[in-house]
């Protein structure tokens, strides 16, 4: 089989700072009013009273959705979405295009390495540039799968289990239990600036959910980089009587020594996890060395599927789990091939967590959601990532080449 070359790469955005609030899509933080994801949630900005009530108050939704589409010479296309908005479009159309167009559709690793190497001088340790590279990488995997007629998980070597089981992230673990999920992860609402009173309030929330959910249902806390090691350690011990399964991303990404200390002093049996906002393979290697229990890369932010596979190998070599930050189909196709991912995350994007809304709604069509907390591998048996782009969304292409 002679594989075609890539003819063109195109980039669109939707949502972001210039759009109406609530576009959703690849930037799932961009939700409308009265949504749990924009409630009073602890963040690194919570120490400033002007920005503690809402994550959108400090601009968490200003980037918007980036859509990258790659077209082969035979007319077939692949696409992906992430969070990078209009600035990501510029990077794709004015810089990364030269490494993509003219390459064979199977040259994914070559393109990936060239994109990483060419952006080192302005990418730093991740962020917007890495989000953009991730989106391109995912689009390339989607195109390759469509050209050869295989789902991405089969390109990675095939499934190691028949189904993926999920825990749910949202404000209502009790509802997640009713939907068949194996656990529920809640955001914390208080931080070091709130002192011991904040610890008591979040521990009381865990206690309340433990009473509602029973003893056998997993409960976890997502701290979203909002704490210091002393506060995190005290919170972990305050929640230990309620059988908290893990405490997540307590600290900013680069505080490796503090993660090491937190793991050393955490209650016996409680896992320490992180990785959502780490943006390079090297940062995950260092994070792994701290001894945390689970690494949680976001495939749309860490360098794409190509990097995620490498991160999983690092974790496996140390006996650690890799459970990606919820990324819908882009992580489904990966984790079903990983032996060290026994479960995965589903992010509840319905406003009150009472219904099953696809994570990237409305930008993806045919995006699967768990049924009774699970997705069978047969649901993934479509070429590429198995989803289509909703072109009825307000897509803008601000740059071309």
Curated annotation (Swiss-Prot):
Cross-referenced PROSITE patterns: MR_MLE_1
Parts forming coiled coils: none
The keyword Lyase belongs to this UniProt entry's keyword annotation: yes
Keyword Aminoacyl-tRNA synthetase among UniProt keywords: no
Disulfide bonds: none
Biological-process GO terms, alphabetical: amino acid catabolic process; carbohydrate catabolic process
Reaction catalysed by this enzyme: L-rhamnonate = 2-dehydro-3-deoxy-L-rhamnonate + H2O
Top-level taxon of origin: Bacteria
Residues the record marks as site: Increases basicity of active site His: 298
Binding site for Mg(2+): 222, 248, 276
Keywords of the record: Lyase, Magnesium, Metal-binding
Enzymatic class: lyase
Gene3D superfamilies hit by this protein: Enolase-like C-terminal domain, Enolase-like, N-terminal domain
GO MF: hydro-lyase activity; identical protein binding; L-rhamnonate dehydratase activity; magnesium ion binding
InterPro entries to which the protein is assigned, alphabetical: Enolase-like_C_sf, Enolase-like_N, Enolase_C-like, L-Rhamnon_dehydrat, Mandel_Rmase/mucon_lact_enz_CS, Mandelate_racemase_C, Mandelate_racemase_N_dom, RHMD-like
Site annotation Transition state stabilizer: residues: 345
Active site (record annotation): 325 (proton acceptor)
HAMAP family: Rhamnon_dehydrat
Family: Belongs to the mandelate racemase/muconate lactonizing enzyme family. RhamD subfamily.
Protein name: L-rhamnonate dehydratase
Gene that produces this protein: rhmD
């Amino acid at each position: 089989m002679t594989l075609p070359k890539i003819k063109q790469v195109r980039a669109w955005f939707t949502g972001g700072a210039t759009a109406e609030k609530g576009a959703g899509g690849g930037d799932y933080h961009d939700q409308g009013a009265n949504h749990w994801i924009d409630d009073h949630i602890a963040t690194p900005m919570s120490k400033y009273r002007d920005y503690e009530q809402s994550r959108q108050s400090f601009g968490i939704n200003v980037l918007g959705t980036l859509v990258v589409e790659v077209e082969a010479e035979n007319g077939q296309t692949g696409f992906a979405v992430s969070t990078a908005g209009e600035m990501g479009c510029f990077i794709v159309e004015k810089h990364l295009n030269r490494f993509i167009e003219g390459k064979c559709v199977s040259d994914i690793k070559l393109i990936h390495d060239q994109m990483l190497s060419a952006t080192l001088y302005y990418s730093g340790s991740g962020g917007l540039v890495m989000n953009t590279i991730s989106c391109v990488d995912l689009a390339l995997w989607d195109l390759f799968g469509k050209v050869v007629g295989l789902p991405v998980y089969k390109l990675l070597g095939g499934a190691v289990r028949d189904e993926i089981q999920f825990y749910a992230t949202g404000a209502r673990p009790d509802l997640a239990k009713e939907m068949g999920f194996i656990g529920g992860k809640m955001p914390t609402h208080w931080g070091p600036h709130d002192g011991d009173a904040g610890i008591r309030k979040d521990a009381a929330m865990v206690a309340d959910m433990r009473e509602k959910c029973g003893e056998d249902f997993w409960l976890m806390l997502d701290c979203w980089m909002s704490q210091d090691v002393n506060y995190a350690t005290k919170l972990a011990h305050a929640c230990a009587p309620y059988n908290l399964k893990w405490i997540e991303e307590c600290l900013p990404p680069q505080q490796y020594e503090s993660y090491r200390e937190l793991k050393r002093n955490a209650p016996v049996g409680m896992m320490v996890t992180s990785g959502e906002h780490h943006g390079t393979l090297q940062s995950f290697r260092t994070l792994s060395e701290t001894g945390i229990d689970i690494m949680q890369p976001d495939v749309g932010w860490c360098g794409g599927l190509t990097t995620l596979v490498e991160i999983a190998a690092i974790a496996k070599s140390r006996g650690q789990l890799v459970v990606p930050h919820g990324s819908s189909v882009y992580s489904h196709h990966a984790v079903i091939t990983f032996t060290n991912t026994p479960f995965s995350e589903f992010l509840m994007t319905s406003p009150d967590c009472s219904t099953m809304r696809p994570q990237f709604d409305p930008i993806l069509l045919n995006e699967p959601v768990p049924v009774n907390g699970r997705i069978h591998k047969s649901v993934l048996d479509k070429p590429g990532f198995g989803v289509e782009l909703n072109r009825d969304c307000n897509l803008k292409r601000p740059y071309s080449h």
